[in-house]
Amino acid sequence: MATYLIGDLHGCYDEFQMLLERVRFDPAQDTLYLTGDLLARGDNSLACLRLVKSLGNAARTVLANHDLHFISTALGVKKIKPRDRVDAIFAAEDFFELVNWLRCQPLLIHNPAQNFVLVHAGISPDWDLTAAKVCANEVENVLRHGNYRYLVENMYAEQPDRWSPHLQGLDRLRYSINVLTRMRFCYLDHRLDFACKLSIKDAPKALAPWFALDNPLYQTGNIVFGHWASLVDETTPPNIYGLDTGCVWGNRLTMLRWEDKQYFTQSAVKKSNAF
């Protein structure tokens, strides 16, 4: 009985299957947590979606920026990006079922028994765990039950870029989405930066990785995230686990067994031609 956490799949189905086979993942006993971005630029996004969905309660994923973009294209709000390889999903007989399943996934998972929080991108430097859970839940409630099309139509903006407990309505939801699914760097005053996707050592000195800012949660809790492939091989604080190691870029897919903190990696079978 083991708990596994795995980085962004991006449609890298073969590597995903190889890792599951290597650890002898048993959905009757084990649990798999995924950092989101199940789809988009790899060769087999449809198979990734179907497999994670088929695992039922044995697999738990968080929503990520590419997942949300896919939902927006399914609604006709956004166009499919040239590098996204999702045509097979749109042609699938279970297309609507997959879209509805995906939009009902959480943005944050807290596992108090095993003392970790899972998000795609990060947690705001101005949030404690309670605020993070509340803000994630507010977005989830709209995507699952409310007028989610209205939110999807209006979630693409870079303002507000700083937290205030007085944020309301779309501004509050948009900030939460940006933090949980897009954030990498922040300015020292905690404003979000959306432009820099570099490694820490190559970033402008005015910016800091979100987890390097002053927030007690970053020191006391275990946070698992994906999203930031350029962090590969860089050192993060011991309780901050970045699992996106750029498989779709031709690097590797990474899985972590939580109980003993053992890592398993699978080199990319091939680099996606979507880049």
Curated annotation (Swiss-Prot):
Gene Ontology molecular-function annotations:
bis(5'-nucleosyl)-tetraphosphatase (symmetrical) activity
Arranged from A to Z, the UniProt key words for this protein are: Hydrolase
EC numbers listed for it are: 3.6.1.41
Presence of the UniProt keyword Hydrolase in the record: yes
Coiled-coil intervals: none
Say if the entry is tagged with keyword Hydrolase.
yes
Superkingdom, taxonomy of origin = Bacteria
Catalytic activity as recorded in UniProt? P(1),P(4)-bis(5'-adenosyl) tetraphosphate + H2O = 2 ADP + 2 H(+)
**Matches recorded under HAMAP family:** ApaH
Which family is it part of? Answer: Belongs to the Ap4A hydrolase family.
Cite the PANTHER family for this sequence.
CYTOCHROME C5, PTHR40942
The UniProt function text for this chain reads: Hydrolyzes diadenosine 5',5'''-P1,P4-tetraphosphate to yield ADP.
Q: What is this protein called?
A: Bis(5'-nucleosyl)-tetraphosphatase, symmetrical
